[in-house]
């Protein structure tokens, strides 16, 4: 039986690359389009209650988190609520959740790579928001 894989945020560059590379290996993704106003706790609840994938890759706000020049604190707050709900839903439905991380959760003073075992020390609003996500 094949795993049901869901990709939130399939419209961004990384999402498109995953879909393309997956297709080359005969890996298909459920890639739902977000609501007009973006994913929120209610729409995520409905989506996961209806689809129940085995694993979910969350790139829903990838552009805002990693590429956009300016993102307001209000946008980050709304995204944080959505990601918290997504994590709760995945835990409740026993869905594996993959969430990209970022170097921005560290202070950047090291010359070598950081690992998930390092103590986070985010700088700026974006780094602090990413650490909470």
Show where each model-derived region lies.
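Conserved Rossmann-fold NAD(P)-dependent oxidoreductase catalytic core, especially the SDR/UDP-sugar
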Residues: 84-123
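Active-site Tyr-X1-5-Lys
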Residues: 121-133
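Glycine/Thr-rich phosphate-binding loops of Rossmann-like dinucleotide-binding domains
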Residues: 15, 65-66, 106-108
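SDR active-site strand-loop-helix element
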Residues: 8, 56-62, 97-103
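Adenosine-cofactor binding site in Rossmann-like domains, unifying the SAM/SAH pocket
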Residues: 23, 27-47
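NAD(P)H-binding glycine-rich loop region in Rossmannoid oxidoreductase-like domains
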Residues: 41-80, 89-91
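N-terminal Rossmann NAD(P)H-binding glycine-rich loop of SDR-like oxidoreductase domains
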Residues: 2-24
């Amino acid at each position: 039986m094949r795993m049901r894989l869901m990709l939130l945020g399939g419209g961004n560059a990384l999402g498109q690359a995953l879909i393309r590379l997956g297709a080359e290996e005969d890996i298909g993704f459920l890639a739902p389009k977000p609501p007009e106003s973006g994913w929120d706790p209610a729409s995520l609840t409905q989506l996961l209650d209806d689809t129940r994938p085995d694993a979910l890759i969350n790139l829903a706000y990838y552009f805002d988190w990693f590429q956009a020049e300016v993102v307001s604190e209000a946008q980050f707050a709304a995204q944080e609520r959505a990601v918290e709900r997504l994590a709760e839903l995945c835990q409740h439905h026993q869905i594996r959740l993959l969430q990209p991380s970022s170097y921005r959760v560290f202070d950047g003073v090291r010359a070598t790579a950081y690992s998930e075992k390092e103590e986070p020390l985010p700088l700026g609003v974006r780094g602090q928001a990413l650490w909470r996500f």
